[in-house]
Amino acid sequence: MKRVAVLLKTVMCEFLKCDYNGYDRIISLLRRILTLICTPNLNGLTIKRVIDSMQSLEYIKQTCNFKLQMCISSMAFKRNNALQNCNHYAWCDDHCSDIGRPMTTVRGQCSKCTKPHLMRWLLLHYDNPYPSNSEFYDLSAATGLTRTQLRNWFSNRRR
């Protein structure tokens, strides 16, 4: 039970650091759950209060999943808008090949699984978006990117 109290306290601290609208209800629910769990008379809790706290936790989970889905979908929307400009580049490539000039080299893109992993890290560390050396090492091992590539990705994302 003490672990749950520590976990909820940590979650509450994380939500307090975030600056999203609509999280006021989540913070009040977390405080209510924390006071329910930390009461010295745990045997005096009724089943209804425990069920209410579980429903509150489920509400928090659904809200967090919704916010995460909104962030991911907005990133996908930006990516789709960027892909619409590809027709212009295709025209340039055809035009350059007709003239006889060599086409420029295109740099490689991050893999599809790398970007969500890095965005998830960035969302979790919203208050301090600068990874430490050990975090760079972990991210490099997880994504397969070099430290320089990671540093460039984070600096571009923070702009």
Curated annotation (Swiss-Prot):
Q: What GO terms in the biological process aspect are recorded for it?
A: cell cycle switching, mitotic to meiotic cell cycle; cellular response to pheromone; mating type determination; negative regulation of conjugation with zygote; positive regulation of meiotic cell cycle; positive regulation of transcription by RNA polymerase II; protein localization to nucleus; regulation of cell cycle switching, mitotic to meiotic cell cycle
GO MF terms on file?
A: DNA binding; DNA-binding transcription activator activity, RNA polymerase II-specific
Q: Name one Pfam family in it.
A: Homeobox_KN
Write the record's keywords in alphabetical order, separated by commas.
DNA-binding, Homeobox, Nucleus, Stress response
Highest taxon of source: Eukaryota
The UniProt record lists the keyword Amino-acid biosynthesis: no
| Localization (cell) | Nucleus
Cellular component GO terms, alphabetical: chromatin; nucleus; Pi Mi complex
Induction of expression? By nitrogen starvation.
What does the record give as the DNA-binding region? 103-159
Residues folding into a coiled coil are none
Is DNA-binding among this UniProt entry's keywords? yes
UniProt miscellaneous comment: There are three genetic loci for mating type genes in S.pombe, mat1, mat2-P and mat3-M. Cell type is determined by the alternate allele present in mat1, either P (plus) in a h+ or M (minus) in a h- cell. Mat2-P and mat3-M serve as donor of information that is transposed to mat1 during a switch of mating type.
Q: Which family does it belong to?
A: Belongs to the TALE/M-ATYP homeobox family.
Described by its record, this protein's role is as follows: Mating type proteins are sequence specific DNA-binding proteins that act as master switches in yeast differentiation by controlling gene expression in a cell type-specific fashion. Required for meiosis, but plays no role in conjugation.
- Name the UniProt record assigns to this protein: Mating-type P-specific polypeptide Pi
The protein's organism comes out as Schizosaccharomyces pombe
Q: Which gene name belongs to this protein?
A: mat2-Pi
